[in-house]
Amino acid sequence: MLLVFALAALPRAAANASESWVSQTDNAGGFALVRGGEAADIVFSAEDFKVVSISAHDLAADVERVTGVRPVVRTNAAGLLGSAVLVGTLGKSPLLDGLVASGKLDVAALRGQWESFVISTVADPLPGVSLGLVIAGSDRRGTAFGVYELAQAVGVSPWYWWADVAPEKKTNLIVTAGARPYGPPSVKYRGIFINDEDWGLQPWAAKTFEPEVGDIGPRTYAKVFELMLRLKANTVWPAMHACTKPFNHYPQNKVVADDYAIVMGSSHAEPMLRNNVGEWTAPPGEYNYVTNREGVRAYWERRIVENGHFENIYTLGMRGIHDSRMQGPKTDAERIRVLEQVFTDQRALLARHVNPRVEQVPQMFCAYKEVLDLYRRGLKVPEDVTIIWPDDNFGYIRNFATPEEQKRAGGFGVYYHLSYLGRPLAYLWLYTTPPALVWEEMSKAYAHGARTIWIANVGDLKPAEIGTEFFLQMAWDMNRWRRDNLPEFLVEWATREFGAGHATEIAAVMDQFYRLNYQRKPEHLQWWLPGQPPRPSALNDDEVRQRLDTWTQLMARADRLHGQMPPARRDSFFELVAYPVRGAALANQRYFQGEQAAFRAVADKADAQRLAAQALVADERLKDETRVFNEQIVGGKWRRMMYLEPADSQWRSMRISPWALPQFTPAPKAAANPPHASGAVPPGFSGFVESNGVVSIEAEHFTSKVDRDGVAWEVIPGLGRTGDSVAVFPTTAASLAPANLTTNAPRLEYQAWFFAAGEFPLTVYLVPTHPLVAGRGLRFAVAVDDQPPQVIVADAKDGSAEWAQGVLNATVTGTTQLKVPAIGRHTLKVFMVDAGVVLDKIVVDCGGLNPGYLGPPETFLTR
């Protein structure tokens, strides 16, 4: 049988829980991987890459995990009978190349593709073999991805080890007949940065998993690299804090990386694969390219000589020894001149020791923190070097390539934080970034040309399992998750990890978990910035009550689901669902009950003591849950992994201090506005009705909308503090002249009924994204009825105190005065000016707005 597939048939496919192509029942032409207690052999060529051997043996172990039957893994096909899994890399596997030469396999469409593969049934592939299951890769990672794709289709989660996900037991494994091509990926280099490992991964590896090394060593990295392949990732920036010895301190680390076909890089602060914190042994002041150019260059050169024959991405440029500004130059002009000389010298080293055609060597320049300002001031980066845009450390990308920049040969990438240690406040404990925010930002970056390198800072990796996978799924296939199917991600994830029976409810629990924590992360339950005196939260009494009630209900749902899990899945459920939900719920109970106790300390001491006792109980429960994580689940496998409030003396200004009951001086709260009179609304009116002097609108509940030339406002489900959000798509849409908005701009329309006329303050709550054009602000316009649109510019300047509060509050606001000409029905219109603006909520204060954190509840009559 000749297998033929065309290039057009190479989708970036991925296994979906809802689309299994491995079943327990026979089907016409199906391949029996396991049937009746017998497993097909797995065959690969000894001449193939090491990662092929690793993945083939992992597949055998995975099949055994599911069926109890372990296939034989062999490197020759002599004596094969019946059926076999045939694994190989084009041009490296005599086994696979023999199939091609004999006409059994046509791989013309696979040749020359990056990390692509096909999984196909093939009749009579070898003498004695009546049916083969061929896994053919275009390169070494393509082959490995194919093997692990089959493992996932069989029923083994990529997180079987890192999150202890137990597969469903099965008797037979029958692969449906046909060819399934995959690749190439949407983003060329896709990976993670292990960071801030001091309080989780490093002590766990050093004292629990790899005590023979006493550090994050080859055994730990082998597990990380295996996970990367199972997630179709290919790049790792290794741990680099002072508590961890440098990656290259252990010679076996780079060998293991190459065995697993992982591309090694280094962070924005570590040029040329050097870990400065552990490897720069000269006085710190000598890490200065102005005064010690030769010494620094020799330091870089030694690493290139040692590692240049492995597959790497080389970070160019120079910052301080750790995450700090470059030493030496005194002005930005000098810094630019020095950095451009650094580029020249670093590329000369790469040309000398890696490849004379230096443009073929993967290189990146990360415009992180202060370095982005230098780029904006004119820093010239070599054309073939990939420029990495950073987020602002809180998930909002700071810069986007212009159409002219997108012509660069080196392309662009993104360095994105799912975990962070730094100003204004760290978030290292729980993973709480909504998948919808990751989707909104990364799809926007991709649309603006960031398609070469994506790296996520995942902290200790645990407990960022969900975010890590979603980020990497997007990088593999940008078309897999879209606005119209975003909510399905959590359902598919829960189905794979815990079975279809509870998947919908688990997904609903996690969706609510992300929404509540988007309002305020559990690590950010303080409302003052470092160096400021403590002050109360911005929530009013109703918001506190509702928040605590919602967390209590969510924790009860998670607890009930935990009890319904089969024993084999309870530990995994605890890690992925129960602990995060309980932890965040208890942290909120602890903080807000403590805050309420502080408020009541003078007026009602008995009530204050009761609330304080409840806060202390929540604190003890939280410690108990963390002890369970570290000491009890999976027999203590994760001992020392989970810490409640990780920080060290170096970062005390960016942390929440060890928890204690808040001590506030009670101050009189602002008096609530008296209820406003209201009148009758005519029958049949559908829209938003002024209530107690306020019109409050969730942005996604527009009455109607007008699209223009393929540009439209669209809902992003799951992104927003109290609902969904709305943004303009495509995000590459050109900005519009304010004078032409009425005729040219896409708009949203909201029918509203007012019981008063006049000029009223309008506040529009936005997701705190950065503008697509640096320095412009987030621009949109509003109008009532046929009035001229008023342009609003929301601009919490990057790095300012307003920005800090914006990312902690998950909102930035734009305001204006809204002229309501008469009592009655009006149409509030919102016009696009620039793409990249994400609307969350709209509030008109007709005189009744009371203080609060989330804005007043929606005031709709019907919709």
Language-model segments: residues:
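Bacterial N-terminal signal peptides
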Residues: M1-A9
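Contiguous, structured surface segment used for ligand recognition
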Residues: A14-P184, A756
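The substrate-binding groove and active-site-proximal loops of carbohydrate-active enzymes
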Residues: K50, V134-G137, D198-P218, N234-T244, ...
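Gly/Pro-rich turn-and-neighbor structural signature
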Residues: V73-T75, E168-I174, H241, N248, ...
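An acidic-aromatic substrate-binding cleft motif
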Residues: S157-V213, R219-A239, G410-G413, S686-V689, ...
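C-terminal non-catalytic alpha-helical accessory regions
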Residues: V165, K169-T171, E488-E645, A737-P738, ...
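Structured mid-domain segments that build the active-site/substrate or prosthetic-cofactor binding neighborhood
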Residues: L229, N234-W237, T244, Q252, ...
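Extracytoplasmic
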Residues: Q650-W651, I656-R863
